[in-house]
């Protein structure tokens, strides 16, 4: 065992050393930047490396520490929210590397307590700490958390570190036999769906703003890694399209494409000014949004040639997904390029895919929903008159593009 560990340590140190130097740092930056997409082969290899390294950790880490990392993980969440809510990433972005005392003074915090929070975060790779100067600087991860960063990931830290955090406390009760409420309904003491509850309690805009920001942040991979060019002049209906960020990204990427949005009445009411007002956020594509539809997509959808659904079917169990896919299949205008592109997670094992497993639990807790494995998607397609033409991984996105064609 000792010889194997020594050999492993040497190999790992050699690998770390091989990453040093300007040229290799440039390749590493390709994986970590949000300004461009990484090379596909490097991205795929990096995912394999992450999975292998995680297997080594699981083999070597004492069982009690494996348990502790799970039951103490809530501290990671709240430390991250503490830093974001007190603008620590923004202060470093504006002022460069700073000591904890400098950061505490600017943010009105206790330096000893901020130090405790920052110690957790920099050991998680969020912020960098240099002992020689005792200063903190931003890493590629913490840079994303600045309020003016185009990806707006700070919104996710807020929504998931607070509203979804509270919802998750209901998971133990939600999984009991006979329980019909999801975890969020238990914790918020309501029988309404979370979408209706959030709308009634002033949280709808926060919810859709957060998911919309995620769509924008992950749009480069969503746009590049599926062949949308085949649909350049199509009219695309985005079903359950939320705040409209995804269909807007598509229209901006493809100037000849036109679009529509299908949502709940409260969401369409919120979205309409974005497209129809001259100063609206999406006014630049407003003339290419042919309609904003209200309805229940489990029953009926308008007839289009092409449909998209992003991060929507995971809100529903199989019985309802069958209804939704069947409704779209009945409505679709069958042409050689007719299709429905579902942008959703495809569950699999391994560290590099764990964000999709977190998504699975989030859907369970918030909507009584679930993410799915590839065989699940194929089974649902076969039941509802579709063939899966392709499943395309999307770089830097928490989903794949599942291309359904009518059969």
UniProtKB/Swiss-Prot annotation:
Pathway: Mycotoxin biosynthesis. Keywords: Methyltransferase, S-adenosyl-L-methionine, Transferase. S-adenosyl-L-methionine binds at residues 263, 295-297. Induction: Expression is regulated by the cluster-specific regulator verZ. It comes from the Eukaryota. The keyword Chloroplast does not apply. Its EC number is 2.1.1.-. One of its GO terms (biological process) is methylation. It is an enzyme of class 2 (transferase). InterPro entries: COMT-like, O_MeTrfase_dom, Plant_O-MeTrfase_dimerisation, SAM-dependent_MTases_sf, WH-like_DNA-bd_sf, WH_DNA-bd_sf. Disruption phenotype: Completely abolishes the 11'-deoxyverticillin A production. Pfam families: Dimerisation, Methyltransf_2. The keyword S-adenosyl-L-methionine applies. Disulfide bonds: none annotated. One of its GO terms (molecular function) is protein dimerization activity. The active site is at 314 (proton acceptor). PANTHER family: O-METHYLTRANSFERASE CICE, PUTATIVE (AFU_ORTHOLOGUE AFUA_4G14580)-RELATED. Belongs to the class I-like SAM-binding methyltransferase superfamily. Cation-independent O-methyltransferase family. O-methyltransferase; part of the gene cluster that mediates the biosynthesis of 11'-deoxyverticillin A, one of the dimeric epipolythiodioxopiperazines (ETPs) from the verticillin family that act as mycotoxins. 11'-deoxyverticillin A is required for normal conidiation. The nonribosomal peptide synthetase verP is speculated to be responsible for condensation of amino acids to form the carbon skeleton of verticillin, whereas the cluster-specific tailoring enzymes are involved in further modifications leading to the production of 11'-deoxyverticillin A. This is O-methyltransferase verK. It comes from Clonostachys rogersoniana. The gene is verM.
């Amino acid at each position: 065992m000792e010889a194997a560990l020594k050999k492993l340590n040497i190999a790992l140190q050699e690998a770390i050393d091989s990453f040093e130097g300007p040229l290799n740092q440039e390749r590493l930056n390709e994986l970590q930047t949000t300004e461009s997409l990484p090379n596909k082969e490097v991205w795929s290899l990096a995912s394999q490396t992450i999975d292998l390294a995680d297997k080594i950790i699981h083999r070597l880490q004492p069982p009690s520490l494996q348990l502790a990392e799970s039951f103490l993980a809530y501290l990671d969440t709240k430390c991250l929210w503490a830093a974001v809510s007190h603008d620590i990433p923004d202060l470093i972005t504006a002022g460069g590397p700073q000591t904890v005392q400098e950061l505490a003074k600017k943010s009105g915090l206790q330096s000893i307590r901020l130090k405790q929070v920052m110690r957790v975060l920099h050991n998680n790779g969020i912020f960098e700490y240099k002992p020689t100067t005792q200063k903190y600087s931003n890493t590629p991860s913490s840079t994303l958390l600045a309020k003016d960063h185009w990806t707006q990931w700070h919104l996710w830290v807020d929504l998931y570190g607070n509203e979804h955090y509270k919802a998750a406390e209901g998971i133990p009760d939600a999984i009991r036999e006979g329980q019909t409420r999801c975890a969020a309904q238990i914790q918020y003491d309501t029988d309404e769906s979370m979408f209706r509850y959030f709308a009634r309690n002033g949280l709808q805009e926060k919810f859709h703003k957060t998911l919309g920001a995620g769509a924008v942040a992950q749009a480069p991979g969503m746009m590049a890694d599926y062949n949308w060019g085949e649909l350049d002049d199509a009219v695309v209906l985005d079903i359950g399209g939320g705040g409209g960020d995804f269909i807007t990204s598509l229209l901006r990427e493809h100037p000849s494409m036109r679009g529509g949005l299908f949502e709940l009445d409260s969401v369409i009411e919120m979205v309409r000014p974005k497209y129809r007002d001259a100063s609206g956020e999406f006014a630049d594509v407003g003339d290419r949004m042919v309609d904003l539809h209200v309805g229940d997509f489990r029953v009926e959808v308008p007839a289009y040639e092409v449909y998209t659904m992003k991060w929507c079917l995971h809100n529903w169990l199989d019985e309802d997904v069958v209804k939704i896919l069947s409704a779209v299949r009945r409505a679709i205008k069958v042409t050689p390029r007719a299709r429905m592109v579902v942008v959703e997670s495809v569950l699999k094992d391994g560290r590099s895919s764990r964000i999709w497993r977190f998504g699975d639990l989030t859907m369970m807790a918030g909507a009584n929903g679930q993410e799915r494995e590839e065989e699940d998607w194929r089974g649902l397609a076969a039941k509802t008159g579709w063939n899966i033409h392709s499943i395309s991984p999307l770089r830097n996105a928490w989903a794949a593009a599942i291309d359904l064609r009518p059969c």
